[in-house]
Amino acid sequence: TGGQSAVRSGLIDEITSNLKEEGLEYITLGGVIPNPLLSKVREGIELCQKEHVDFILAVGGGSVIDSSKAIGYGVANPNNDVWDFCLKKAVPTGCLPIGVILTIAASGSEMSSSSVITNEETKEKRGCAKTDYCRPKFAILNPRLTYTLPQYQTESGCVDILMHTMERYFVNIETMEITDSISEALMQTVIYNARILMKEPDNYSARAEIMWAGSLSHNGLTGCGTGGGDWACHQLEHELGGVYNVTHGAGLAAIWGSWARYVYEVNPERFAQFATNVFDIPCGTDYKETALAGIEAMENFFRSVEMPTSLHELGLDLTDQQIHDLAFKCSFEDTRTIGVFKQLNMRDMEKIYLMAR
């Protein structure tokens, strides 16, 4: 579990009571924080090995689920160090089965094969082995469990959901009409309901729409026929999260507009399609003009739900050297590129961070 909210709400007591009634033995591990830490994962692996755990129930949001996946990998692969899976030095051959009771709509980890862990010693935030071994066996989605979330966390979650589809949507290849249509409808649904939740945090219908959108946005559905997606914004944000511990969705909002303006000219028609089909912006013969209008519309949405559109608004006033260091880390010390819509090298990454400042 994460912090104390699931305890205060009585959810943990309800779960443990049900387990006892069914005669199921259990142990608990709490204290998972946003941008979940490798040290907590190692603690969980040691606990599971000591107590001979054979199933993990993740009660929380993305950080709790991602930690559970990494713990599951570590227990099922005792001859490997779990961080080696994040560094791609090793590949897991299994994972403890995982179930989810979701309390935060955001990451989509309840239906995904992804997990992200932060090494607090090296300030690195890395994906931990993308395999179907860690995909949860079941997930219980009750929108009422999200009523008590603070507004900032709710809206950060909505941005994360949007970005999981947008990262797959903005590719520079021929895509499938059905996938595009699903993606565009999902984005419209999230935008519409995120605005409702600003005024009505206990609106069940809006919470339900957002919660289901979160699962559909990251289970692979919106990536069919897109070649896997771009993911540059996530890579750029991972460095912000790893070094400065920012909220993931808010970090994505702060970066996205600068990334979009930096790359849109590679394929302005794709951005124009986004503008027209998501924001109903008329598309004339000038795709670039329509594309920029769509980028501005998305940034205006971020502002309308009080999400940042710059690093300064995110609470980061970074020096040129700090931005250079972020790009150096994101490029794995100038040894890799990121993105597929436009491949970005270290210099490109630095320019986007500077634009976002």
Predicted region positions:
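N-terminal small/polar loop signature for handling phosphorylated ligands or for N-terminal nucleophile
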Residues: 7-79, 196-207
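Acidic, glycine-rich active-site loops and adjacent beta-strand->loop/helix elements
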Residues: 32-36, 63, 71-75, 89, ...
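Acidic-glycine-rich active-site phosphate/pyrophosphate-binding loop
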Residues: 42, 135-139, 227-234
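A glycine/threonine-rich phosphate-anchoring loop and its flanking beta-alpha core
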Residues: 77-175, 273
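C-terminal charged capping/lid subdomain of soluble metabolic enzymes
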Residues: 133, 271, 278, 282-357
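Active-site segments that bind and position negatively charged phosphate/pyrophosphate groups
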Residues: 168-297
